[in-house]
Swiss-Prot record:
SUPFAM superfamilies the record matches: F-box domain (SSF81383), RNI-like (SSF52047)
LRR repeat windows: 103-125, 128-151, 152-174, 203-218, 219-242, 249-272, 288-314, 315-339, 344-369, 403-414, 415-437, 450-474, 503-518, 519-541, 584-594
Record domain F-box: where: 1-49
InterPro entries in the record: F-box-like_dom_sf (IPR036047), F-box_AtFBL13-like (IPR053781), F-box_dom (IPR001810), FBD (IPR006566), FBL60-like (IPR055294), LRR_dom_sf (IPR032675), LRR_FXL15/At3g58940/PEG3-like (IPR055411), LRR_PRU1-like (IPR013101)
Database matches in Pfam families: F-box (PF00646), LRR_2 (PF07723), LRR_At5g56370 (PF24758)
Top-level taxon in the UniProt lineage: Eukaryota
Keyword vocabulary terms for this entry: Leucine-rich repeat, Repeat
Organism: Arabidopsis thaliana (Mouse-ear cress)
Protein name as catalogued: F-box/LRR-repeat protein At3g58980
CDD domains: F-box_AtFBL13-like (cd22160)
Organism placement in taxonomy: Eukaryota, Viridiplantae, Streptophyta, Embryophyta, Tracheophyta
Record Gene3D superfamilies: 1.20.1280.50, Ribonuclease Inhibitor
Length: 594
């Protein structure tokens, strides 16, 4: 103890930050010097998904045991599996105790039922600088914000699956009004249509705003006001309402848009010319006139700018434009692009995040929607970047138009999963309007390296073999310190890959197949000698040729068997989990699911 006591105060405080609330409380009685130092607790954390974390009651008791003179800077409470009505009172007592101890950063990552009510003291805390409410698993309802709500120090507010339902006055608007210095507001998994609110997002101090809608089925809300005169960053992924009556975005510098037009207030996918569009983004689009950086993040957004092109203002400050073509249908038209480019007199960089647009049936022609690329003739573009360029005849033909019509072009960056070989020389020989234009090609797989990546989460991702090697395995090989990988909503049958998961460093692996498919993998290999945790929910393939799970401690299995796995009528094969089952021989905890 003497050696530790001789350390500087800063180091001792850092050591304390790794203690639980109860341990910190017990340690505070060791000496007078330690008691004084422990009046500041750097961080408290509870996560019911972490093994050996202890119970929520133990954590609450530890917090309540802290001296009343102590100060807690940060606390994260993550209660998803264990958070049920019997814990509501304990949880709220813990929150109130933290609020009395000068909490600066509070994260309440919880999924609670309709009967849960957040302590009203949260809305009158004078010390909170950052507040995070809700969870990806469901969040909770805020049905009352007190009249005396006052959060004078709050700069960052994150809401996840939070719904506001104050019938007397708009609780959401009241909350924003209580935040005198709010700089950043993030609303994830938002459902306007389930809120009871005024439709006003108003803050004179707000600088960054992120909104993402969770489902787009029916949206009956009619209007949203954006009264945020100091906003510099906007990320909006949402269904477009009937109107944006007030749009005050004069300070906006960067915007990312994923807008979906509604047909009769319902999600209709891509809009047809004969559809009755209930959405109107006119004022929103016009309100973007001062932006410098813009990202149109989906073909749905392309449609919004196309159908309402008359609202597109002159983007006098816009110098960097990104269009994200994440649709698998290359033929989806780009009518919006000429309208936008013509309104960008100072555009310097265009990033096409995805493939170029062309008609696959007529690859050497130009789609009518691009008007022969004539809009490029007056464009001052200097840098063109294409993130998914395969060098097909159709893509080469489209690229020619950019090279031949952009007289100020200085650099073309082409990112590809394909090794060009001799085609690269042909690419460099293409004629250009600018003598200063250089073309650089980047082989994404060849240069793949993620030296610091420890956690990799893939959700609904597919891998295709475009360069003669397994893209998925190439990705794993590029992660020399990978510890955890989570793969959700998989569709193995649509992948082009080797059927192998190989990593020498991987410790935790979760695999969750989306559908019980009629056909499945012939084989799957686990080459993961350091793996200690496996959560495996998938169909059993024809075989497991290699299973290296010698370090496995815990396994959760939900295995499906297909009795008619055939590639064709003459080549049947069956599911065989033999080697997988044998490979589990060292596990200590085994859970089998139906």
């Amino acid at each position: 103890m003497d050696r530790i006591s001789n350390l500087p105060n800063e180091i001792i405080c850092h050591i304390v930050s790794f203690l639980s609330a109860k341990e910190a409380a017990f340690a505070s009685i060791l000496s007078k010097r330690w008691r004084n130092l422990f009046t500041i607790v750097i961080k408290l954390q509870f996560d019911d998904s972490v093994k050996n974390e202890g119970s929520l009651k133990d954590f609450v008791d530890g917090v309540l045991a802290l001296p009343t003179s102590s100060r807690v800077r940060s606390c994260s409470l993550e209660c998803r599996r264990e958070f049920d009505p019997t814990h509501y009172d304990d949880f709220n007592r813990c929150i109130c105790a933290l609020l009395k101890r000068g909490i600066l950063d509070l994260k309440l990552d919880i999924c609670a039922g309709r009967r849960y009510s957040l302590p009203l003291e949260v809305f009158t805390c004078k010390t909170l600088v950052k507040l995070e409410l809700g969870s990806d698993f469901g969040g909770f309802v805020v049905d009352l914000v007190p009249e005396d709500a006052f959060l004078p120090a709050l700069e960052t507010l994150l809401l996840n699956y939070i719904r506001f339902k104050d019938l007397r006055r708009c609780a959401f608007e009241k909350l924003l009004s209580a935040c005198l210095v709010l700089k950043e507001l993030v609303i994830h998994n938002m459902e306007w249509e389930r809120w009871k609110w005024s439709g006003n997002i108003s803050s004179p101090t707000l600088e960054r705003l992120t909104i993402s809608h969770v489902d787009l089925y029916e949206c009956e809300f009619t209007r949203i006001n954006l009264d945020t005169p100091n906003l510099t960053y906007l990320e909006l992924s949402d269904a477009v309402p009937d109107d944006y009556p007030i749009v005050n975005l004069d300070s906006l510098v960067e915007v990312k848009l994923d807008l979906t037009l509604m047909v009769d207030h319902k999600y209709h996918g891509y809009v047809d010319d004969n559809d009755t569009i209930s959405s109107n983004p006119t004022n929103l689009i016009n309100g973007l006139r001062n932006v410098e950086i813009m990202n149109l993040q989906s073909p749905n957004t392309f449609q919004a700018f196309s159908y309402f092109h008359e609202a597109i203002p002159v983007f006098k400050n816009l110098y960097h434009l990104t269009i994200t073509n994440n649709d698998t249908v290359i033929g989806f038209c780009w009518e919006f692009l000429p309208f936008v480019i013509k309104k960008c007199p100072n555009l310097k960089t265009l990033v096409i995040d995805g493939p170029l647009h062309y008609n696959e049936d007529r690859p050497k022609s130009v789609c009518h929607c691009l008007s022969g690329y004539s809009f490029l003739l007056s464009c001052p573009l200097e840098v063109l970047q294409i993130t998914d360029y395969s060098g097909t005849p159709g893509e080469v033909e489209q690229l020619k138009h950019f090279l031949e019509k952009l007289s100020g072009l200085k650099l073309v960056k082409l990112h590809s999963l394909t090794r060009f070989g001799s085609d690269k020389k042909k690419l460099l020989m293409l004629p250009r309007a600018s003598s200063k234009c250089k073309i650089k090609h980047y082989d994404s797989l060849e240069n793949a390296l993620l030296p610091s990546l420890k956690t990799l989460i893939l959700d609904s991702v597919k891998f295709y073999d475009r360069c003669g090697c397994c893209a998925f395995q190439k990705l794993l090989s590029a992660c020399p310190v990978l510890v955890e990988s989570v793969m959700r909503n998989l569709e193995w049958e649509d992948w082009e890959w080797s059927g192998c998961a190989s990593s020498q460093t991987l410790e935790r692996l979760t695999i969750d197949h989306r559908y019980w498919a009629e056909h499945n993998l012939e084989s799957f290999t686990f080459d993961t000698p350091s793996l200690t945790y496996l959560d495996y929910n998938a169909h059993v393939p024809g075989s497991y040729p290699t299973v290296n799970l010698d370090s496995l401690v815990e396994a959760k299995l939900n295995l499906g068997f297909t009795t008619d796995l055939v590639e064709d009528d003459d080549d049947p094969f069956t599911s065989d989990p033999t080697n997988l089952i044998k490979g589990l021989r060292n596990v200590e905890i085994l859970r089998l699911w139906m």
